[in-house]
Amino acid sequence: MADPAECSIKVMCRFRPLNEAEILRGDKFIPKFKGDETVVIGQGKPYVFDRVLPPNTTQEQVYNACAKQIVKDVLEGYNGTIFAYGQTSSGKTHTMEGKLHDPQLMGIIPRIAHDIFDHIYSMDENLEFHIKVSYFEIYLDKIRDLLDVSKTNLAVHEDKNRVPYVKGCTERFVSSPEEVMDVIDEGKANRHVAVTNMNEHSSRSHSIFLINIKQENVETEKKLSGKLYLVDLAGSEKVSKTGAEGAVLDEAKNINKSLSALGNVISALAEGTKTHVPYRDSKMTRILQDSLGGNCRTTIVICCSPSVFNEAETKSTLMFGQRAKTIKNTVSVNLELTAEEWKKKYEKEKEKNKTLKNVIQHLEMELNRWRNGEAVPEDEQISAKDQKNLEPCDNTPIIDNIAPVVAGISTEEKEKYDEEISSLYRQLDDKDDEINQQSQLAEKLKQQMLDQDELLASTRRDYEKIQEELTRLQIENEAAKDEVKEVLQALEELAVNYDQKSQEVEDKTRANEQLTDELAQKTTTLTTTQRELSQLQELSNHQKKRATEILNLLLKDLGEIGGIIGTNDVKTLADVNGVIEEEFTMARLYISKMKSEVKSLVNRSKQLESAQMDSNRKMNASERELAACQLLISQHEAKIKSLTDYMQNMEQKRRQLEESQDSLSEELAKLRAQEKMHEVSFQDKEKEHLTRLQDAEEMKKALEQQMESHREAHQKQLSRLRDEIEEKQKIIDEIRDLNQKLQLEQEKLSSDYNKLKIEDQEREMKLEKLLLLNDKREQAREDLKGLEETVSRELQTLHNLRKLFVQDLTTRVKKSVELDNDDGGGSAAQKQKISFLENNLEQLTKVHKQLVRDNADLRCELPKLEKRLRATAERVKALESALKEAKENAMRDRKRYQQEVDRIKEAVRAKNMARRAHSAQIAKPIRPGHYPASSPTAVHAIRGGGGSSSNSTHYQK
């Protein structure tokens, strides 16, 4: 505590305007204002106050005059009190509260809530503030907590400094004006009001809003504390004017009784002669004991009616204000000393106590000498100057025959009476505590009974609902599992079939490319043979012409000779014909020999093709196994990566094919050059054909070796994936067993709330899995669309190539037929070449027909796959809708469960509220230098100067 100082109570007088009833009644406006401090009622005497506020005064002006300075004093460590006094309907509640959320019409209390924080944010940044508020009312002379309506009869106690306080009152820590306003709104909703003839919203109780501010300097550790009482008194009433009856009349009696007790306290303090001030006559005066004549800066706002109808009450109120103005309060700063200061004070008091003990001992020795009849010389007598220089004497006991000092009788009686009075007051406080505890216990037990009944009924209903919902969800879960299994199986089949078809398409494309290469080679050979054939035809035509000319000449000669010789011409013609027939027979024999060789080559090529088909079938089987393994792998890998890999592989294949095409074109050019060089002999061509067949066999062996290596790698990968599938299946079985155990435990346990939470979590996990499966399905659908587009493009290009190939073949066949018709009797070499080309054409037509059949098979398979894809899409949509419904049901169940848990928590909190009336709360420290954050409920310790803010949590008990 700092050194005390004396100050008087400030009294402000406020007159309200005439209300509608007074204007309609024609009441006269009686006050006359003389300056800012004097008012005269009618023709009476003047009343002087610290400030007189006329009816046109705004709420802000009232606040600046009455409360602004007190806020600064409280933040400097003083106690403060502001209360409004006056008759009913005189504007007390309007002055103290006003319209809470209207910036123009809000009263003193909400303005103080904002002004406190404005002052704090402009103060030194090293200060840290803890602000807590409480709100209670005195109704029927019982203290009722407005923040906890279950506390209906609280007791008033005194702390170690004999300062009264309300025991058990709810205290809320606040850190922003919004939180203070929330507390005010909550408390105001619980306050007692009633309708009377003079006021539609008449307060039926005295309300007290207490703000407790503690501040600490984090550098110097200096601690200050201040309390601010904001009191809205209920107005005094005349029953003849208010028309109160029944419960309202009882309330009016208690209001007038407590206000008369307040008047008695003011009168006793104003006279200054009475030794006893009746603070204990009412609980309101007991709470305001420190505000009236104690350690507090107090401002009283007396509210008056200007109507002549209320002239007597107005004069009584003004007299009350004049008496209160004479009261003196002794105020001091509430300074909490630090440990070092306490230590210094203790040492100082210890030294003082030591010197006083020495003085007492010397005085007792001197007194003992006087009582024994010994005269003590003046130089040995102890004076006030010598007290500090005394040495401690021996601890000699005081003699027993010292006569006790008898005090005055009046002092003993006074002390005795004071002790009796204090003991009676203590008994009274104990009885109040006991009554309060019993009443709270009774209400608590009643509430517990109601809560238990309601809780039991609700838990039964909820248990039945939860059981029904659980069975329904189990059925839906099983159905969903079956559908998911079917969808997965269908997707697996679809993926396997698609991979097979894609592999077949790739094989066909490769075969097609090979055939196109062979076709290009054959076309080149065909063009060369056609050129040779044209040259031979020209030569044969020239020879025919010469032969015909020679024959004609010979025939002429023979005819001339035949005229002379009769039959020789026929013989010569027969001989000529015979020679021609021999040549034709030789050519036919040579052609038949070539045909037999070509047939043997065709049979050998067919055998090679059958072997290649077998290897292709084996390769397809291994590729199907590989596709199945890749399907299992693709379920665990991202489709995007696989697509990018696939595109890269396709790009590499395209580049390889382009490179191979370039190399083949180069080889083709070389072969053309070789063919031009080796056109002389047909045997060289046969050798080249044999070398090509050997190269084909070597390529086939290399392909078989490559496929064998691929097959081994695929087999290893398949075994590894099967092991992973077995492990996953074991994990699934373990999870299923765990789920069954949890379900069995759920049927046995009495409380189902935690189990429902676990089931909700499992349901969410399943939903997430289904969502992942759905995402994978969507990715697979997109991949399938992309592959379908690529397949369709490849098929289109193949179809176009087929058309071009057929057209080219038809044109060439027509040309060859025309050439055959033109040249029926060519040479044997020409016929051999023609037969060779015919055989090649037959092989090419067979290959083309096979490609057409494969294309038709693929087109037949395509609608089946599309149909299966549509079915899977519909099934997935149905699963999505079922999943959505299950999710919505789960959300509804969770909300209902959360509401039930909140209701149970509220019931338990209401049951245990009385038990933990003084339990620990989290304080919200405030530091100057910053305005509060956007969230009003956030716990912030704010430093000034734009520094960083750090969260700080303090626990107060």
UniProtKB/Swiss-Prot annotation:
It catalyses: ATP + H2O = ADP + phosphate + H(+). Highest expression in brain, prostate and testis, and moderate expression in kidney, small intestine and ovary. Its EC number is 3.6.4.-. Residues 911-957 are annotated as: Disordered. Oligomer composed of two heavy chains and two light chains. Interacts with GRIP1 and KLC3. Interacts with TRAK1. Interacts with ZFYVE27. It comes from the Eukaryota. One of its GO terms (molecular function) is plus-end-directed microtubule motor activity. ATP binds at Q87, S89, S90, G91, K92, T93, H94, K99. Residues 8-327 form the Kinesin motor domain. Keywords: ATP-binding, Cell projection, Coiled coil, Cytoplasm, Cytoskeleton, Disease variant, Hydrolase, Microtubule, Motor protein, Nucleotide-binding, Transport. The lineage of its organism: Eukaryota, Metazoa, Chordata, Craniata, Vertebrata. It comes from Homo sapiens. Composed of three structural domains: a large globular N-terminal domain which is responsible for the motor activity of kinesin (it hydrolyzes ATP and binds microtubule), a central alpha-helical coiled coil domain that mediates the heavy chain dimerization; and a small globular C-terminal domain which interacts with other proteins (such as the kinesin light chains), vesicles and membranous organelles. One of its GO terms (biological process) is anterograde dendritic transport of neurotransmitter receptor complex. It is linked to Cortical dysplasia, complex, with other brain malformations 2: A disorder of aberrant neuronal migration and disturbed axonal guidance. Clinical features include intrauterine growth retardation, fetal akinesia, seizures, microcephaly, lack of psychomotor development, and arthrogryposis. Brain imaging shows malformations of cortical development, including polymicrogyria, gyral simplification, and thin corpus callosum. InterPro entries: Kinesin-like_fam, Kinesin_motor_CS, Kinesin_motor_dom, Kinesin_motor_dom_sf, P-loop_NTPase. This is Kinesin heavy chain isoform 5C. Changing E237V: In CDCBM2; the mutant protein has a complete loss of ATP hydrolysis activity; colocalizes with microtubules throughout the cell but does not appear as puncta or accumulates in cortical clusters as does the wild-type protein. Changing E237K: In CDCBM2; the mutation results in a significant decrease of excitatory post-synaptic currents when expressed in cultured primary hippocampal neurons; decreased localization to distal regions of dendrites; accumulates in dendrite cell body. Residues 859-956 are annotated as: Globular. Its main location: cytoplasm. Residues 406-923 form a coiled coil. Belongs to the TRAFAC class myosin-kinesin ATPase superfamily. Kinesin family. Kinesin subfamily. The keyword DNA damage does not apply. Residues 174-315 are annotated as: Microtubule-binding. It is found in: Cytoplasm, Cytoskeleton; Cell projection, Dendrite. One of its GO terms (cellular component) is postsynaptic cytosol. Microtubule-associated force-producing protein that may play a role in organelle transport. Has ATPase activity. Involved in synaptic transmission. Mediates dendritic trafficking of mRNAs. Required for anterograde axonal transportation of MAPK8IP3/JIP3 which is essential for MAPK8IP3/JIP3 function in axon elongation.
